[in-house]
Amino acid sequence: MKKILEVTGLKEQQVAPVVKGLSGLLADLQVYYSNLRGFHWNIRGAEFFVLHEQYEKMYDDLAGKIDEVAERILQLGGKPENRFSEYLKVAEVKEEHELVCAASTLKNVTDTLQIIMAKERAIAEVAGEAGDEVTVDLMIGFLSGQEKLVWMLSAYATK
């Protein structure tokens, strides 16, 4: 059986930077996922009902994106990391523990999305240069939903 890169026509040396970018993104997404779970469990205050439900929707959606990123790494000949201890070494997104009010969790989410979206744009650019349209499409799809989410969260947070 041929390796996937032989079948797709992509070159290992060209997609290596894509795999590296996706691996970093995977680490950030995993930390973000963990933070969202904590926000969901620990949110307090008048916005509890709205944000408790919203954060659950967000981490459910994110679980699918994490799987897509890990599978794309495999499709490009890489091996996705699965150890949280390794994610923490390379992730730009940091673990959160004590955020429980609406304002602080919303700020963290929008700050995190800013980091993640910048990485996705960079990955899309590198993937485009490598002729990897599938990864470009994956990143554009993620960005589309995230930009809408940032707009909605910003509108919600505006007093």
From Swiss-Prot:
Gene Ontology cellular component list: cytoplasm
CDD domains the record matches: DPS
Major site of localization recorded for this protein: cytoplasm
Keywords linked to the UniProt accession: Cytoplasm, Iron, Metal-binding, Oxidoreductase
The EC number(s) this enzyme carries: 1.16.-.-
Domain of life per record: Bacteria
Key word Metal-binding present: yes
Family named by the database record: Belongs to the Dps family.
Function: Responsible for protection of cells against peroxide, especially against hydrogen peroxide. Required for survival in host cells. Although it binds iron, it may not contribute to iron storage. The iron-loaded dps has DNA-binding activity.
Oligomer status and interactors: Homododecamer.
Name of the protein in its database record: DNA protection during starvation protein
Naturally occurring in which organism (per UniProt): Porphyromonas gingivalis (strain ATCC 33277 / DSM 20709 / CIP 103683 / JCM 12257 / NCTC 11834 / 2561)
